A protein has these predicted regions:
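ATP-binding N-terminal substructure of ATP-dependent carboxylate-amine bond-forming enzymes
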Residues: 1-96
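Short, charged, surface-exposed secondary-structure boundary motifs
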Residues: 37-40, 54-57, 101-108, 150-151, ...
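ATP-dependent carboxylate activation and anion-phosphoryl transfer catalytic cores
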Residues: 45, 66, 217-326
Length: 326
């Protein structure tokens, strides 16, 4: 079996479980002993925080101890560190080049990158660069990070000034697009070739993550995602977010170089992304199968819970409930 190390495991029980069902041995790492995904892996380990100099050496030790072939980050938090440390880690890191990861993690630099590569994107400015004739409404958005925290809609210049003073984080200003928003989950090989792209509607989101959606067979979106993924030389999973405006054109707003929050939907639609990832770890070269998925699959997500008990050595383990008396 191929061993896979999941970093910043957090709450991504869905991803850890999907890889195990695909035949992987899951090794989950996190700094927080209460991260639920730790306890759904075959092996789990507590590691230093990302900013600690011991973070990468701790991951390398897990790679050596468990013969890890593939490293999969489950949040944006450590992607730059991992992308810069490929040689030291000693396993395939499922991320694009470090420069692409860094630029996509900064919404203003991502906007410039899209323009450089000929990818349509909404007009975007730094706060001191908004032109006087900019059309309102405008969005004030956090420059870094993920989710929908610190996003404000300004109806006029007075509101724009207020929100730029109110927001606690470094921000950008972006044109507010009409039309419908879509997410496209892509998976690319280690050479940046797009193997599949699965569009989905955004029926409902919470905290920036899709919690309700439906897979759709939209050839324009599939081709858009392939073109974007290959222009940027993406590697592994990525979630591409875009708007389709009234004239039918598309504008990219964000790309997350990881499995998106709506990952259960492309998985249920037959995307087989964990199997593709394991094939790459084994040195195989899967052929592209664009459009190979089921349309009309609806996802609705919900919260679950996990009870833990002390393990006797300062660690925790899942609580085993005896129901013999029920």
């Amino acid at each position: 079996m191929t061993s896979v190390l999941f970093t910043c495991a957090g709450q991504r029980v869905d991803i850890v479980g999907a890889f195990r069902r695909a035949g992987a041995t899951a090794v989950a790492a996190d700094a927080n002993p209460l991260a639920p995904a730790l306890y759904h892996a075959d092996v789990h380990a507590l590691v230093p925080r990302i900013e600690d100099p011991g973070y990468v050496p701790a991951l390398r030790a897990l790679v050596e101890q468990h013969d890890v072939r593939l490293i999969v980050p489950l949040t944006d938090l450590d992607q730059v560190v991992l992308a810069r440390s490929r040689a030291e880690l000693g396993a395939v890191v499922l991320l694009p080049d470090a420069e692409i990861v860094e630029r996509l993690g900064d919404k203003y630099l991502a906007h410039l990158l899209f323009e450089e590569r000929g990818i349509a994107t909404p007009p975007t400015w730094l706060p001191n660069g908004v032109p006087d004739d900019a059309a309102y409404p405008l969005l004030v958005k956090a420059r870094h990070g993920f989710g929908s925290r610190h996003i404000y809609r300004a109806a006029d210049a007075a509101q724009l000034g207020f929100f730029l003073g109110y927001t606690p984080v470094e921000s950008i200003v972006q044109a507010c697009l009409g039309g419908e928003e879509f997410s496209i989950d892509v998976f690319c090989d280690l050479e940046g070739r797009c193997l599949n792209a699965i569009p989905r509607t955004m029926i409902e989101s919470k905290g920036g993550e899709s919690i309700k959606g439906m897979s759709i067979r939209d050839q324009q979106l599939i081709e858009l995602a392939r073109d974007v993924a290959e222009k940027l030389q993406l590697v592994g999973p990525a979630n591409i977010q875009c708007f389709r405006v009234a004239d039918g054109s598309h504008y990219l707003t964000d790309i997350n170089t990881r499995f998106g929050g709506g990952f259960p939907l492309p998985l249920a639609a037959g995307g087989r992304y964990p199997e593709l990832a394991l094939a790459l770890a084994r040195g195989e070269h899967p052929e592209p199968r664009l459009g190979d998925f089921r349309e009309g699959i609806v996802m609705t997500r919900f919260f679950s819970d996990l009870s833990l008990t002390p393990n006797g050595d300062g660690t925790l383990k899942p609580l085993s409930v005896d129901r013999s008396e029920d």
